[in-house]
From Swiss-Prot:
Glycosylation sites: 85, 128, 149, 331
Positions annotated as active site in the UniProt record: 91, 278
Any GO molecular function: aspartic-type endopeptidase activity
UniProt region (Disordered), positions on chain: 391-419
One Gene Ontology term, aspect cellular component: lysosome
High-level lineage: Eukaryota, Metazoa, Chordata, Craniata, Vertebrata
Protein known as: Napsin-A
Disulfide bonds listed in the record: 104-111, 269-273, 312-349
Pfam families: Asp (PF00026)
Length: 419
């Protein structure tokens, strides 16, 4: 090899970021929910009533799964050998992986409208048989634990424990656009004490670091929902720097929030409060009195179930709503927090702030869902012996300028199931 070629090769290798090669990318699909089919905000009022229990014991805690009817971001995973594909919600507010099973109860309506895992079709399946149950306000989801290989993005054959759902209650699951849920919360949230998928991938050496990040695309064009990145974050997705906020209670991704401000006037959470960053929640929720004051300051008016509406035409003139986290203000414009019911700038729009009183010991809490996360990239870092668990936030790069580049990159990592 000539000295010139050797020099060029060294320069090329020196410019490569070693961490980039280790990132696992999972495309997210954005699904537009039909408001006429099901009110996408249904079930929120049940959040304070929902508790999770396991047949193997453990302390009850709140698991707001009915909120998923309003979630718009989904991805594809595979279970078994060969992989059986499922559309799942990647949820930072829970820690279990579950999908419907071919062994589900005949009267479990949700099973008949979704993809089901068939253990007989997988050569790598291992039975566990331990029963699990998750209690909801509308009934109990129950099933058995099993073990098999998980395929996600560029990761193959991650051996995980997951739930085969045998009974899924109510229309909430039957009408859902997703088959199951992949939890990305901490192990303390896991029903049955099972090892969460993220922990399994790290333990098996498939991920170098227990870190993942979300890049959500709230652009109304197409179904491209952005990207879940496992093992780190992609600097091309955000404008530095990242602001890291320590996790206060490692169960949900819960942090301390210093305050909330509307424009240059109203201040909320004045003495500080707790907030959860939750990818499984679409809106921003908070204590009813504070949300009522916030929406009033914006100019919205109440409707049902803690929802507020506003004239769509007012969106460009609405004040910013700012959240003080880690000593930095994170701002949302009217374009960020106003949700169109119809693809039109006339008529009524939903405001992305909803009243929700979560009782003690879990509450009171603010939940910062996709309305908050949309303009930002969120990095969820479990930490190590030197750094505790934390969440990093940075302003996302413009979606319009990098849409084509991301589509090309996504195609290289994972082929989505049609539909």
């Amino acid at each position: 090899m000539s000295p010139l070629l050797l020099l060029l090769l060294c320069l090329l290798l020196g410019n490569l970021e070693p961490e980039e090669a280790k990132l696992i990318r999972v495309p997210l699909q954005r699904i537009h929910l039909g408001h006429r089919i099901l009110n996408p905000l249904n079930g929120w009022e049940q959040l304070a009533e929902l508790s999770r229990t396991s047949t193997s014991g453990g302390n009850p805690s709140f698991v707001p799964l009915s909120k998923f009817m309003n979630t718009q971001y989904f991805g594809t995973i595979g279970l078994g050998t060969p992989p059986q594909n499922f559309t799942v919600v990647f949820d930072t507010g829970s820690s279990n992986l579950w999908v419907p099973s071919t062994r589900c109860h005949f009267f479990s309506l949700a099973c008949w409208f979704h993809h089901r895992f068939n253990p007989k079709a997988s050569s790598s399946f291992r039975p566990n048989g331990t029963k699990f149950a998750i209690q909801y306000g509308t009934g109990r989801l129950s099933g058995i634990l099993s073990q098999d290989n998980l395929t996600i993005g560029g990761i193959h054959d991650a051996f995980v424990t997951f739930g085969e759902a045998l009974w899924e209650p109510s229309l909430i699951f039957a009408l859902a656009h997703f088959d199951g849920i992949l939890g990305l919360g901490f192990p303390t949230l896991a029903v049955g004490g099972v090892q969460p998928p993220l922990d399994a991938m790290v333990e098996q050496g498939l991920l170098e670091k227990p870190v993942f990040s979300f890049y959500l695309n709230r652009d109304s064009e197409g179904s491209d929902g952005g990207e879940l990145v496992l093992g780190g974050s992609d600097p091309a997705h955000y404008v530095p720097p990242l602001t890291f906020i320590p996790v206060t209670i490692p169960a949900y991704w819960q942090v301390h929030m210093e305050s909330v401000k509307v424009g240059t006037g109203l201040s909320l959470c004045a003495q500080g409060c707790s907030a959860i960053l939750d990818t499984g929640t679409s809106l921003i929720t908070g204590p009813s009195e504070e949300i009522r004051a916030l929406n009033k300051a914006i100019g919205g008016y109440p409707f049902l179930n803690g929802q507020y509406f506003i004239q769509c035409s007012k969106t460009p003139t609405l004040p910013p709503v700012s959240f003080h986290l880690g000593g930095v203000w994170f701002n949302l414009t009217g374009q960020d927090y106003v949700i169109k019911i119809l693809q039109s700038d006339v008529g009524l729009c939903l405001l992305g702030f909803q009243a929700l009183d979560i009782p003690k010991p879990a509450g009171p809490l603010w939940i910062l869902g996709d309305v908050f996360l949309g303009p930002y990239v969120a990095v969820f870092d479990r930490g190590d012996k030197n750094v505790g668990p934390r969440v990093g936030l940075a302003r996302a790069q413009s979606r319009s300028t990098d849409r084509a580049e991301r589509r090309t990159t996504q195609a290289q990592f994972f082929k989505r199931r049609p539909g």
